[in-house]
Amino acid sequence: MDARIVNALIGSVYETIRDVLGIEPKTGKPSTVSHIEIPHSLVTVIGITGGIEGSLIYSFSSETALKVVSAMMGGMEYNQLDELALSAIGELGNMTAGKLAMKLEHLGKHVDITPPTVVSGRDLKIKSFGVILKLPISVFSEEDFDLHLSVKSGG
């Protein structure tokens, strides 16, 4: 995968989490993986079309999701994954994908993003094709977020 795209992804994730949650995230070492493993119970998927075809996939635990929602609501404690919480989780992914789209535009790759899809449950599996980049992220605790960028073409 083009290093400029990897750097755009890392920058987008870092800036979005910092600006939206008010927390300086630590990004782990990006790596190319053969398939997407979902160790957590909550997933946000956003499609990417245009100059790059693929998906941006966030995953984290329900506990981490509630911390994200609380931070997005200005620190107000939130303790249930209701429609409002799931909408906020989707919006975090949407903001990350939007920032990535702007950075890709500067690289000459015009992309559009789909609305986020949020899925929760156990033993989630996602099948994706193309090159898959995994980026572990530490926000509230060690590697509590996983991010995957799956690129079928254009990357």
Curated annotation (Swiss-Prot):
EC annotation from Swiss-Prot or TrEMBL: 3.-.-.-
Keywords annotated in UniProt: Chemotaxis, Hydrolase
Gene3D superfamilies for this protein: CheC-like
Superkingdom as given in the UniProt entry: Bacteria
Gene Ontology terms for molecular function: hydrolase activity
GO BP: any one term: chemotaxis
Keyword presence, Electron transport: no
Keyword Magnesium: no
InterPro entries reported for this sequence: CheC-like_sf (IPR028976), CheX-like (IPR038756), CheX-like_dom (IPR028051)
Pfam families: CheX
Subunit structure: Homodimer.
Function summary: Involved in restoring normal CheY-P levels by dephosphorylating CheY-P. It has a greater activity than CheC.
Family the UniProt entry places it in: Belongs to the CheC family.
PANTHER family: CHEY-P PHOSPHATASE CHEX
Protein name as annotated: CheY-P phosphatase CheX
Organism: Thermotoga maritima (strain ATCC 43589 / DSM 3109 / JCM 10099 / NBRC 100826 / MSB8)
